[in-house]
Amino acid sequence: MKIPTRKIASAAAMTTLTSVSLAAAIEYRDALDIAVAPREEALERTDSLVLSAGDRIAYNDNVYLLPGYITDLTTLPGIGPNPSRKDYIDSISGGMDAEWLTGGRQSFDLGLHADYNRYFRNQDLNNVSSNDRVAWNWGLGNALSGQVGVDYQRILGGFSNTLVYSRAIVTRTDYFGSMRYQIGPRWGIFGGVLGTEYNVSAAQGTFNNSKSRGVDLGADFTTDTNRIGFDYRFNDSRAPNSIVLNGIVFEPDYREDRARVLLKYALTEKTLIDASAGYLKRQYPNGTIGNFSGEIWRAALQWQPTPKTQLLLGVWRQLDADLTSQTDYFVDKGVSLTPLWIASEKITFSAVIGRDTNNYVGSNPIGPIPVAPITEARHDTLTSETANMLYTPIRAITITVSAGHSTRNSNVSQFHYNDVQGSLSIVYKFFRYGNTP
């Protein structure tokens, strides 16, 4: 019996987390990680097209992620007129997902998703977000295959690591290309290139703008349920501007080497482990500021005791950074537990309980904004609890209800917060063509 490993991803998709790092049980894979992995061949593939529309109403009782002692929001740097700690957000969305088969092993994928996000009170935060992808999946003979494509993301920058509270739109663009050479049915050699561009619209955040170029090489041995392999990634990141941190000129450019062993192994018919472990070294021009070298690892254990229940346990140690603050990065160690229950063909419940600690690497304990100095690097502890219900009354309609709470404690008082969120969303697939879910 083959374990349905795709359910790990579906459980993650149902979960809304305040902290992205709390989703690390399901390892973050960038566009190139996805492109070089063995591709699961879909059965009965056809040309397909899905058009959808939706609406999401969300409530957030701490939009700016402020500590409790701040009561007068009008004194905060950069904040808009008539600010409110609590707010409702209405997000109207539209999307298109398509696949065109142009040959036996050739296809084009297109995904376009846009949201208009309207804040009821903090109207200066209104924004348009999007998450788009176009990719060409190619194959040559029986042994060569790969992907070429572009991913684009546009979001409102969060307020978890900032002391300026104006609207900042963050965009990330990934350009990627990969190739896999299959040596027989089990062994494979892969490689690829990745270019990434970060841009932050707010003037106070432009020091985080960067362009990076990466190369990935590796090999693996795969079966129907198992995979063992290794990969090496080199990344060269360049930022246009230097910044002054704690009185020292800091160059955000860096070079990074990462080597990992990759493992996916079915322990039993009901238990699967997906893990990686390796070593990462990051070097900055300022030899005494910001350099990091050490082990990184992650393990996710999926247990499916019945066809309708699943438990996912994750632990990790990674080098991470907030999307809006690429120069302010940290060592993230955490654990999460994700139960999932398919109550019926139409209703699924899931939850996430997570805890992680973030130890900021000595580039700066709090970033370039001067506040009360501290004698040690910043250290945060985050906890989060989230519950979700997904209801599909008919195949074309999906309704999701979500509620969550998160807390961050820090040795820098400005970064304490408690946050409660809730949301109700509905998505209607009003047009479907081909073999679509």
State each model region's role:
Residues A11-V20:
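Bacterial N-terminal signal peptides
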Residues K2-A12:
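Bacterial N-terminal signal peptides that target proteins for export
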Residues P4, V20-L22:
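Cleavable Sec-type N-terminal signal peptides
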Residues A24-P437:
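Gram-negative and organellar
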